[in-house]
Amino acid sequence: MDITLVKSLYRETEKHMDKEVKINGWVRTVRDSKNFAFVEVNDGSFFKNVQVILESSLENFKELCKMPISTSVEVEGIVQPTPNAKQPFEIKATRISIEGKSSTDYPLQKKRHTFEYLRTIAHLRPRSNAFSAVFRVRSLAAYAVHKFFQERGFVYTNTPIITGSDCEGAGEMFQLTTMDLNNIPKTEEGKIDFSKDFFGSPANLTVSGQLSAETFALAFRNVYTFGPTFRAENSNTARHASEFWMIEPEMAFAELTDYLDNAEDMVKFVINYVMENAPEEMAFFNSFVDKGLFDRLDNVVNSDFKRITYTEAVELLQKSGVKFDYEVEWGIDLQTEHERYLTEQIFKKPVFVTDYPKDIKAFYMRLNDDGKTVAAADLLVPGVGEIIGGSQREERLDVLEKRMEELNLNKEDYWWYLELRKYGETKHSGYGLGFERILMYITGMTNIRDVIPFPRTPGSAEF
């Protein structure tokens, strides 16, 4: 007999009713009495467990009643309806064999565990209800991202993980070397001699695939990347990780408004896809993680995102009369408390803030006619703050070079990026979406460490 997945039992219940099936999976709970036992089994294919009924007539009944949680089993039995129970069916076992025993000291017992504790056993936490739901949603959301862009003719491109350029110009990068740290070669000037290193020059882990993606956008028109990025920021907060995933589309012949339209459509598409394809997981989050989750997501999907300039945002915050921890004045980078006030108290929906001061944005963002601001925009959402940052890119070579000089960037490091402006340059735009940020928003999880399988944060690179 072929194996039947538990997902099939739930999605096609009538097809299996009163028929014999064979499943395999891991024991989640065992409840026994003198003549019966109830075993919940999860096979990994579905969020919910299946209840298996054991009768004392089974030859290994006593052994089965003593199974520790997480024992792997193979079950044969008849699917039968349960009209008065929470689950629509159960399996009356005719045979159960133990495939692999678990230990009685298995850490995930029936009691509820804190997310903090589960982070210490990241190799086991996917087996818990909460993280089973999180990582199923992560998989569906990743698929939805690809589906959105592929259906709109975008070309998926892979950008390098190891790079010699700093996209953000911030310098907070992880450096790579194969040199002996106890005997680092030096130049005559006493500086590190990178010519002796593996790549012959300094190399780092990428902070963004944007610059490389721009090269492909100027050949394929519309492209996107989706991969890991790394920031050596010593930010030990619930919203920052040292390794995370970024979605970065780049669009040729596109202005700032084209980016805004695309980003709004994409966010709504991904949320809708997850809501439709993970109803059980989303119901779990709405019940046990964030009781207002459905209302919040419905508001996002069904509202038109507000668009205001940075200057307008500053004026609104100053007029609010609220005493923020960080004082609001023109020229500062908006903090999370400012972003959340705009989205939660003033507009009560997602907000694009555009046209930021050039001094707080990256060198590649297009300078506006006022000479003080750039054609940049961040998407702010209720409950989280910023989840997307992007801009129209600076296509004018002379303006771009002047901007790099102002920021003391070495133009030789970006020679290939500058050269793009010489050969058929056009206006183009793009943005970056932190994948974990939108996962936090969709699931209601409040810590980035809980939406990525093995979080990497300052002082922690376990597993």
Swiss-Prot record:
UniProt KW Protein biosynthesis keyword: yes
Q: What are the alphabetically sorted keywords of the record?
A: Aminoacyl-tRNA synthetase, ATP-binding, Cytoplasm, Ligase, Nucleotide-binding, Protein biosynthesis
Tell me one Pfam family matched here.
Answer: tRNA-synt_2
Tell me the GO molecular function terms: asparagine-tRNA ligase activity; ATP binding; catalytic activity, acting on a protein; nucleic acid binding; transferase activity
Q: Which InterPro entries match?
A: Aa-tRNA-synt_II (IPR004364), aa-tRNA-synth_II (IPR006195), aa-tRNA-synth_II/BPL/LPL (IPR045864), Asn-tRNA-ligase (IPR004522), Asp/Asn-tRNA-synth_IIb (IPR002312), NA-bd_OB-fold (IPR012340), NA-bd_OB_tRNA (IPR004365)
Q: Where in the cell is it found?
A: Cytoplasm
Q: Which cysteines are joined by disulfide bonds?
A: none
Q: Name one GO biological process term.
A: asparaginyl-tRNA aminoacylation
Please give the chief subcellular localization of this protein.
cytoplasm
Q: Which reaction does it catalyse?
A: tRNA(Asn) + L-asparagine + ATP = L-asparaginyl-tRNA(Asn) + AMP + diphosphate + H(+)
> May I ask which residue range the UniProt record assigns to the signal sequence?
none
Q: Does the keyword Protein biosynthesis apply?
A: yes
Q: Name one GO cellular component term.
A: cytoplasm
Which PROSITE patterns does this one have? Answer: AA_TRNA_LIGASE_II
Query: What CDD domains does this protein map onto?
Result: AsxRS_core, EcAsnRS_like_N
Query: What does the record give as EC number?
Result: 6.1.1.22
NCBIfam families the record matches: asnS, PRK03932.1
Q: Which family does it belong to?
A: Belongs to the class-II aminoacyl-tRNA synthetase family.
Please give the subunit comment from the record: Homodimer.
- What name is this protein filed under? Asparagine--tRNA ligase
Organism listed in the record: Clostridium botulinum (strain Hall / ATCC 3502 / NCTC 13319 / Type A)
Q: Which gene encodes it?
A: asnS
